[in-house]
Structure formats: C-alpha cells, structure tokens
C-alpha cells in the first residue's frame, strides 16, 4: 500500500493529556489551518472530560433523555460519549488526490484493530458500519470498542477516533451510541479482564496510525457479516 498523505515528512504526534472538547475543537481548526498553509500533518492524542457530542446525522430520540447537554459537531456519524479512560485521536492530515475518505477511515480502523490484537483482543469490522468491534458470541451481541467520525475540508481531515480503554461504560446508557440499537459498547478493560489505561495504549496507537496512513500497515480483511 502507498501513503494516503500528501506530505512525505513524518506525522507530528502531540500528547495533550486531558483537554475539554471545545478547546480541542479550536486546536483542531488551528492545526488544520496550519496544515493547509504548509505545516506538518499532526496527530493529537488526548482524553476529554465527560461530554456527549453529536454528529450531523444524530436524531432527536438518540440524545440523552435526561436533558444532559450535548455538543453539536460537524463530523460525520451520530451521538457518542467522550470521557476519562478513553483515548481520543484527532489526525489532522493532508490527503492525496483524488480524495478517498473511505480508505482513510479503513486505515484508522486497521490501526485500532492492530493495537487491540497486540493487547490480546480480537476485533473486527462490521459490514456497513464504521468503527472497531468485538464480535458477537453466544451470550452477547457485537460490542463497539472503537468509534470513528471524521470530516474532510480543504483536503485536510478533522475529528477522528476514540478507543475505549478503561472508561465508565455506564455513560453510554443515556444515549443511543452512534445511533445503533442492536449492539453494545465495551472497553479494553472489560474485555481483557485487567485494567488497560490510556497511557498503556497511546504510543501503540500513535505508531499504528502512522504506519496505516503511510501504507506500512496494510488494510486487512476483518469483516463480520452482522452484529447479532
């Protein structure tokens, strides 16, 4: 595979700790402006304080029933939760022409699938749905462990992915996460039976994302046909 990035210089990885969503969104826009002006591709890695964010396709009934505030965004997808114990990545990347947004998403998925495998967890894609999933078994439906929602403007990507490491999964119970009613949500900690922190996975994710974007990590076939 070849690189999907228009630049040949390495991706600049920035670990930001915990940053509120509004500040992170402003930083994304500033970083994207800099990239369009000739600056580097950048991967922002961080955690957010608890917040619900809604993509452009979110329906009213998918929002919190208790009136919890929601930040409306211009990314694709529907509503989700961000908070402590979840690694959020915002790749601000200049894409090659012609733009292939689906391929960009598949490369992000591949990076998260690879990191999960390194930690001992088998994950897959679900046909027709973005993100990374633990496949269904005899007792449970498929569970989403990694979410992806992006926007491309001026051939530059915004928003990105979220990997549930050691987060409070009960936060998802107030919404219909990603608009999906027939599947669950899980975390690395819940699936592996040990605490898996953001710090443990952040460097792995950074390396895998850079490898996937540059074509060193090819996109494999991880499809599962259904969620039930």
Swiss-Prot record:
A GO term from the CC aspect: cytoplasm
Residues spanning the membrane: none
Superkingdom of the organism of origin: Bacteria
Localization: Cytoplasm
Root EC class: transferase
Sorted UniProt keywords: Acyltransferase, Cytoplasm, Transferase
Role summary: Catalyzes the transfer of endogenously produced octanoic acid from octanoyl-acyl-carrier-protein onto the lipoyl domains of lipoate-dependent enzymes. Lipoyl-ACP can also act as a substrate although octanoyl-ACP is likely to be the physiological substrate.
Name of the protein in question: Octanoyltransferase
Species name: Mycolicibacterium smegmatis (strain ATCC 700084 / mc(2)155) (Mycobacterium smegmatis)
């Amino acid at each position: 595979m070849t690189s999907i990035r228009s630049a040949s210089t390495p991706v600049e990885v920035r670990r930001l700790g915990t940053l509120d969503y509004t500040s992170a969104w402003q930083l994304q826009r500033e970083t994207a402006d800099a990239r369009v002006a000739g600056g580097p591709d950048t991967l922002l890695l961080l955690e957010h304080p608890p917040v619900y964010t809604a993509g452009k396709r979110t329906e009213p009934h998918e929002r919190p029933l208790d009136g919890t505030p929601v930040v409306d965004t211009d990314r694709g997808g529907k509503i989700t939760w961000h908070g402590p114990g979840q690694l959020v990545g915002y790749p601000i990347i200049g894409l090659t022409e012609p733009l292939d947004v689906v391929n960009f998403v598949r490369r992000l998925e591949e990076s998260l699938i690879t990191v999960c495998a390194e930690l001992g967890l088998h994950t897959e894609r679900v046909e027709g749905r973005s993100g990374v999933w633990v496949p269904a078994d005899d007792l449970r439906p498929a569970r989403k462990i990694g979410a992806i929602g992006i926007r491309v403007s001026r051939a530059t990507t915004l928003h990105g992915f979220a990997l549930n490491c050691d987060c409070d999964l009960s936060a998802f119970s107030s919404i219909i996460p990603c608009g999906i009613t027939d599947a669950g949500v899980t975390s690395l900690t819940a699936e592996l039976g040990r605490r898996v922190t953001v710090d443990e996975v952040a460097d792995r994710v950074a390396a895998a994302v850079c490898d996937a974007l540059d074509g060193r990590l090819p996109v494999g076939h991880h499809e599962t046909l259904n969620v039930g």
